[in-house]
Amino acid sequence: MSKVYMMVTITNRNKRKDFRTFFKEYGLPVFLETTGRGTAQSEVLDYFGLEESEKLLFLAIVTGETWKKLRRGLITKMLIDVPGTGVSFIVPLSSVGGRKPLQFLVNEQEFEKEEETAMKDTDYELLVAIANQGYIDTVMDAARAAK
């Protein structure tokens, strides 16, 4: 049985071609790539070794085994552990809406669906919001005000 995770990789935009090639070479043909503008304060950027600039964000659904291979490659080939190169991390997923979308997202990865269980109580949840251009300040104000 396999657990699935959302892998998030944030890097500079000039690394687009390198990361696309890397993900395909490591058996990850399905990923979302989008541009981003950070809202983190400078202390947070310093902690993760990021600079204030326009960023590139890659999102992919990976299994635990795929993440192990990718993590090694991100360090040895992409040098993601070097400050200023970027950051990559995974977030466990508790649910994916439907069998077909799940099969598409884990395309070419070895995956055996686990038995369905009830949602677990957790200390934190990640909420992903997609907003139209010009509304980022409104969304971030609401997120910061949430308790």
Label each PLM-derived region with a short phrase.
Residues M1-K147:
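Positively charged, small/polar-rich N-terminal and surface patches that mediate targeting and assembly
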